[in-house]
Amino acid sequence: MASAMAGAGPAPGLPVAGGPVVPGPGVGIPGKSGEERLKEMEAEMALFEQEVLGAPVTGIPTAVPAVPTVEAMQVPPAPVIRPIIATNTYQQVQQTLEARAAAAATVVPPMVGGPPFVGPVGFGPADRGHLDSPEAREAMFLRRAAVAPQRAPILRPAFVPHVLQRADSALSSAAGGPRPMALRPPHQALVGPPLPGPPGPPMMLPPMARAPGPPLGSMAALRPPLEEPAAPRELGLGLGLGLKDKEEAVVAAAAGLEEASAAVAVGAGGAPAGPAVIGPSLPLALAMPLPEPEPLPLPLEVVRGLLPPLRIPELLSLRPRPRPPRPEPPPGLMALEVPEPLGEDKKKGKPEKLKRCIRTAAGSSWEDPSLLEWDADDFRIFCGDLGNEVNDDILARAFSRFPSFLKAKVIRDKRTGKTKGYGFVSFKDPSDYVRAMREMNGKYVGSRPIKLRKSMWKDRNLDVVRKKQKEKKKLGLR
């Protein structure tokens, strides 16, 4: 812009640095007073500042009109008084812009504080005024917003028995050397009675549950109030089987020193190794040692190494369970007890033998399993001279009018399946048996008249045949 202005020359009516105002054509310089010239210069400066700062410029007149025209072109006064443009105005504007850019680039991030401040669990009525003040509320809000709620984890062993800590303290005091990191006790500020969980912020507690305590800003609130906690259980209570072996393994893995194993032997004896005790506890005289659990009987295969070692639930399952005692009856009822019959139990325990029906006739014997299908106490009729068309259904339909009718069967050849011309009919009632013999003898069943006889199936049994032979021998018939 300056080069363009320098090449074109000063515009009429604009001030030149270090020189007078160039008047426009037709304007007489001697006719203007000093106040009018000052107003024209201020108007031109305002237009020039707008052009430099990038504001829209309506346009610069080529000639400066008379006094009324100058009053019409005046810009309304700005609320902030602007300095007069000098030769170093451009440099000042550049420095201001650079300072703003540097300030925007170097924005201070939110400050991250240290560990969160844990206030006292309870506070008195005198401290409520401090918490209700706006400064305390703002500080508490900023602390909750900026500080993470979780505390950094402390690197320490997961579990160190009390006996090992006592033995280690006695060993380090006697030897004068530092403790191993794995057996060092935690910081004293972290040692205290076991709590169910981390306490919440003091503002979340009800007003009646807050106990009087030190002021909010005091550092004494970091430690919990001193109370008399319950005595911790001595080492060896509830730790299960193989307690001494576990102590030796923990000491050997943590310290790796021979003195630590000696300290375990001292601590396992039951006497305290030194005055240093982590946490409050009762004296050893008040602690009642529990009896050691009885060793469980192990199977012979596990002892010989044939099977892998069993776990604790499996060992507990091997312990013989005591049987519940049987209720004893009163002494007066002892004589009324009846012993259970042993014969019935023996009969029930043995499987029933399958009956075998052995028949004998014409000097030969054979087994007939078809006789097992019939009732042994029935009254059976032999039916002869049956036609080839007669089957079990036809024979049963002919004798089914009798109330005690049981079964009817036609005997067939096993190889060909053809009928042999005879069959059997059984009844439960002997009266029906007699009626059937009288009424059905000679009647047509199928295409032929039926012939009925008394069945002799019992006479063909081997037992009956032998019995008859013995009777005949006694009578001297044969």
Curated annotation (Swiss-Prot):
GO terms for molecular function: mRNA binding. The modification N-acetylalanine is found at residue 2. Interacts with HNRNPK. It comes from Mus musculus (Mouse). Residues 379-457 form the RRM domain. It is found in: Nucleus; Cytoplasm. Residues 193-205 have a biased composition (Pro residues). Residues 1-33, 171-207, 317-354 are annotated as: Disordered. One of its GO terms (biological process) is negative regulation of mRNA splicing, via spliceosome. The modification Phosphoserine is found at residue 133. Binds (via the RRM domain) to the 3'-untranslated region (UTR) of CDKN1A mRNA. One of its GO terms (cellular component) is cytoplasm. This is RNA-binding protein 42. Residues 343-354 have a biased composition (Basic and acidic residues). Expressed in cell lines (at protein level). Expressed in heart, brain, spleen, lung, liver, skeletal muscle, kidney and testis. Residues 1-20 have a biased composition (Low complexity).
